[in-house]
C-alpha cells in the first residue's frame, strides 16, 4: 500500500528551489515602492557572486589537473555570468536619485561594501589585504571565508601551475604585498611569451584569463557610474567614501603580467 504521506512530501518545483524561503527574504524597511527593486537586484547579485565563486573554485581544480579543455568551458560560463551581472546595472539605473533617497536612510550602515562574497572573489583573483576583514566579526562566517580565500592559491597561481603541467618552465613568483595585488614579474612574462608563441590550448586559457580580468574591470566601471548617477559624491551608507572610493578600484588589473606581454607579441 502506498503511504499517503509520501505524496505530500513529494519534491516540487517550489520545494526544490525553496521558493517559500526565497520569496520571503525580501523585507523592505519602508513603504517606498522602489525599495523592493533595490533589494531584489542586490540579492540577485549575491546569488551570481555565489555561483562565480563556485565556478572559480572548480576552475582551479581543473587547472591543477592540467585539464585545459574543462578550464576553458568553465571560464566561458564565468564570463557569461559576468556579462549578466554587468547588464543588471541597467535595471537598478531605472531608479532615479530621488526614488533612492526616499528610502536610503532606512539602510542605516548597511552597504555593498560589506559583501563578503565579493571580497572572497577579490581574494581568489589575487587581492591580499587584511583590511578586507575589518567589516566582519572575527569568528564569523564572512571573516573566515575571506581569510581562507586569502590564504589559498590565487587564480593566477593556479594558471601558473597549469602552465607547468603543460611543460613550461614556470619560475618562482613574488608574493602579493600585505595590502594589494601581486606585482608584475618579468620572469613570468618571459614564460607567458613562450606560451603565446606556441599558440596552443594554453594560450587560449591565458586569453580567457584576460577576458576574466576585463570582465571584472567592466563590472567595477559600471558599478561606479551607477553610484555616481544615483548619489553623486555622497559618502556610502557603510561609511566608505562612496563613488570616490570605488574610483580607486578602477583599472587595477588582477593579472598584470598577462597585460604586460601584449606589447611584445
Curated annotation (Swiss-Prot):
Alphabetized Gene3D superfamilies for the sequence: 1.20.58.480
Q: Coiled-coil stretches, from where to where?
A: none
Catalytic activity line of the entry = L-tryptophan + O2 = N-formyl-L-kynurenine
The first-level EC class reads: oxidoreductase
Q: Which InterPro entries match?
A: Trp/Indoleamine_2_3_dOase-like, Trp_2_3_dOase
- Tell me the domain of life: Bacteria
Under the GO molecular function aspect, what terms does this record hold? heme binding; metal ion binding; tryptophan 2,3-dioxygenase activity
Chain positions recorded as substrate binding sites: 38-42, 104, 237
Task: Kindly tell me the pathway this chain contributes to.
Answer: Amino-acid degradation; L-tryptophan degradation via kynurenine pathway; L-kynurenine from L-tryptophan: step 1/2
The Enzyme Commission number assigned here is 1.13.11.11
- Database matches in Pfam families: Trp_dioxygenase
The record describes how the cofactor is bound as: Binds 1 heme group per subunit.
Give the protein's biological function. Answer: Heme-dependent dioxygenase that catalyzes the oxidative cleavage of the L-tryptophan (L-Trp) pyrrole ring and converts L-tryptophan to N-formyl-L-kynurenine. Catalyzes the oxidative cleavage of the indole moiety.
What is said about its interaction partners and assembly? Homotetramer.
Q: Which HAMAP family match?
A: T23O (MF_01972)
Q: What is this protein called?
A: Tryptophan 2,3-dioxygenase
Upper taxonomic lineage: Bacteria, Pseudomonadati, Myxococcota, Myxococcia, Myxococcales
Question: Which gene underlies this protein?
Answer: kynA
